[in-house]
């Protein structure tokens, strides 16, 4: 097996360096610094988003228990499926948006994404009991409620994606987008801190907070787009 790996490695190097004549070169420090400055807002934005999206399960596990974590995780997995169409659409049209910078096209795709998210949410809302039984093997009323509450954020995410990452970023406002995402993260951490100080951390309050962050993000993005005339 090791010999096979070495053979594959050597063959790959021969093709890249010998046949295709690819040559490696050191990037000038000035270009590296410029690329770093350009990518920093997006890096900070993604990091901030990951914090307020993924910390919920950690908080529930730390303050409540594994049963609550499993219930929230089940609802979160359904939420990820609901977000998937909007995410795929956003990725597919991003090159076209960056190239043409057509706000009318962005709005058209955004409303299409919202419509799909609404359809998914309505289906999930009326079929949540069946989904819980399918995934858990039993009826859990709390899981159905959490799933319905958390599903609202799928609609908000489909809007926020086209107000932020697919509008501000390709139109040259990456730093504005970064400030909005950092603001969302700070809002989430502040609200979670207040819940902790008041002893109000429950599965329902954490879920409402997750939706509340998306509402805050929506308001922030609408305000920023309005100020920029987008």
Regions found by a protein language model. Give the residues of each.
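Helix-loop junctions and terminal segments of transmembrane helices
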Residues: 79-102, 164-170
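Alpha-helical transmembrane segments of multi-pass membrane transporters
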Residues: 9-14, 117, 124, 179-203, ...
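Interfacial segments at transmembrane-helix termini and the short loops linking adjacent helices
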Residues: 126-158
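Membrane-interface junctions at transmembrane-helix termini in multi-pass inner-membrane proteins
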Residues: 98-99, 154-182
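Transmembrane helix-bundle signature of multi-pass secondary active exporters and lipid flippases
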Residues: 49, 72-91, 120, 150-157
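Interfacial/gating helices of multi-pass transporter permease domains
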Residues: 31-38, 42, 58-80, 140-145, ...
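Interhelical loop/hinge segments that connect adjacent transmembrane helices in multipass membrane
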Residues: 9-53, 92, 96-104, 227-230
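Short, small-residue-biased leader/transition segments that mark boundaries at the very start
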Residues: 3-8
């Amino acid at each position: 097996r090791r010999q096979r790996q070495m053979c594959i490695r050597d063959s790959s190097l021969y093709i890249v360096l010998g046949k295709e004549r690819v040559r490696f070169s050191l990037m000038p420090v000035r270009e590296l610094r410029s690329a770093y400055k350009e990518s920093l807002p997006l890096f900070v934005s993604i990091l901030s988003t990951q914090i307020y999206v993924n910390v919920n399960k950690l908080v529930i596990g730390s303050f409540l228990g594994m049963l609550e974590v499993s219930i929230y995780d089940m609802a979160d997995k359904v939420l990820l499926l609901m977000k998937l169409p909007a995410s795929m659409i956003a990725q597919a049209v991003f090159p076209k948006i960056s190239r043409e910078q057509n706000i009318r096209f962005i709005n058209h795709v955004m409303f299409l994404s919202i419509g799909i998210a609404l359809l998914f949410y309505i289906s999930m809302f009326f079929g949540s009991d069946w989904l819980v039984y399918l995934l858990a093997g039993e009826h859990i009323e709390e899981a159905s409620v959490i799933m319905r509450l958390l599903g609202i954020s799928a609609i908000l995410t489909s809007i926020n994606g086209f107000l932020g990452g697919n509008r501000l970023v390709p139109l040259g406002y990456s730093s504005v987008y970064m400030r909005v995402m950092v603001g969302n993260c700070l809002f989430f951490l502040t609200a979670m801190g207040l819940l902790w100080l008041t002893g109000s951390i429950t599965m329902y309050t954490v879920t409402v907070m997750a939706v509340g962050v998306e509402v805050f993000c929506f308001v922030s993005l609408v305000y920023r787009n309005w100020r920029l005339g987008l």
